[in-house]
């Protein structure tokens, strides 16, 4: 379902689509004879979109640094310039919590609980974060206010969300939709990027076999695989530039035989198949 969510992201059926099912089911994915599969996904797409749409240079530099959370810790002067994920995991973890909380509407109470600190210290960190990335927050606040005045939100390509009420009711409780409004322009433009990439890849005769949130899976003949893989990655980067005005890098996972799982999912698949094997002789 290409426009199945309010943000315009795809929403395939969990009972009919392998990437919406439990992860162990991905073991059934396998390229056709004479082909490889490749899974291409946009790396840290949401923060990249935030930076490019708002023009916040601190956000953009944080994304382009390769590690948003370590870069933010450096902006707070909490780690040295040569800090890495390996050398300062604790500080990195702090700014991962703060980043997600500020960008998606969590309050200081939730942050304090996650960081095991006082609410006042959580407020201080969150206010500092908003000050460092003030261009982004000024943009998102303005985007929401302007959209509410029009009573609808819109992406640069015209996908819209019409606002009838600022509240939803769930299980008899009234809830403000502010968090989803903060997230909407980011996710919706992510959907636009994926659609643009799909169009451009199809125009260049790539066989797109799956769409997965911010990723595509392609099937490419082995003799031309290396060249076509690089072409596909560049097409996806170019699609991000068309939509949000800046390049979003693309990671790759090549599948030459059956899909390789993480250990816990592989164990579950093996367990399920062993149970099936026990019963198979009974019906032969």
Q: Residue ranges of each PLM-predicted region?
A:
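C-terminal polymerase-core module
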Residues: 131-183, 223-284
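Catalytic palm subdomain of template-directed nucleic-acid polymerases
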Residues: 50, 107-120, 216-233
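Residue-level preference for well-ordered alpha-helical positions
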Residues: 73-77, 112, 116, 237, ...
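Short, amphipathic alpha-helical "recognition" segments used to contact nucleic acids or chromatin
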Residues: 93-104
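Non-catalytic nucleic-acid-binding interfaces of large nucleic-acid enzymes and RNP effectors
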Residues: 1-36, 43-45, 66, 91, ...
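Extended, well-ordered alpha-helical scaffold/bundle regions in very large, multi-domain proteins
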Residues: 104-143
């Amino acid at each position: 379902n290409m426009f199945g969510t309010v943000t315009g992201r795809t929403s395939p059926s969990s009972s009919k689509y392998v990437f919406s099912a439990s992860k162990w089911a991905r073991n059934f994915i396998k390229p056709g004879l004479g082909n490889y599969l490749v899974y291409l996904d946009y790396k840290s797409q949401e923060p990249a979109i935030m930076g490019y749409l708002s023009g916040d240079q601190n956000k953009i530099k944080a994304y382009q640094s390769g590690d948003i959370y370590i870069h933010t810790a450096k902006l707070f002067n909490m780690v040295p310039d040569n800090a890495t994920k390996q050398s300062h995991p604790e500080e990195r973890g702090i700014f991962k919590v703060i980043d997600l909380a500020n960008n998606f509407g969590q309050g200081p109470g939730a942050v304090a609980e996650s960081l095991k600190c006082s609410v006042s210290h959580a407020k201080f960190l969150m206010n500092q974060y908003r000050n460092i990335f003030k261009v982004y927050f000024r943009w998102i606040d303005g985007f929401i206010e302007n959209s509410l005045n029009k009573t609808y939100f819109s992406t640069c390509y015209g996908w819209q969300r019409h606002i009838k009420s600022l509240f939803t009711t769930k299980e008899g409780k009234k809830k403000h939709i502010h968090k989803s409004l903060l997230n909407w322009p980011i996710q919706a433009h992510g959907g636009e990027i994926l659609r643009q990439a799909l169009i451009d890849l199809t125009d260049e005769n790539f066989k797109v076999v799956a769409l997965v949130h911010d990723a595509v899976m392609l099937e490419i003949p082995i003799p031309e695989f290396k060249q076509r893989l690089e072409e596909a990655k560049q097409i996806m980067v170019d699609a991000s530039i068309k939509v949000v005005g800046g390049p979003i890098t693309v990671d790759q996972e090549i599948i030459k035989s059956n899909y390789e799982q993480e250990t816990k999912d592989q164990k579950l698949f093996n367990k399920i198949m062993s149970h099936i094997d026990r019963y198979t002789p009974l019906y032969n």
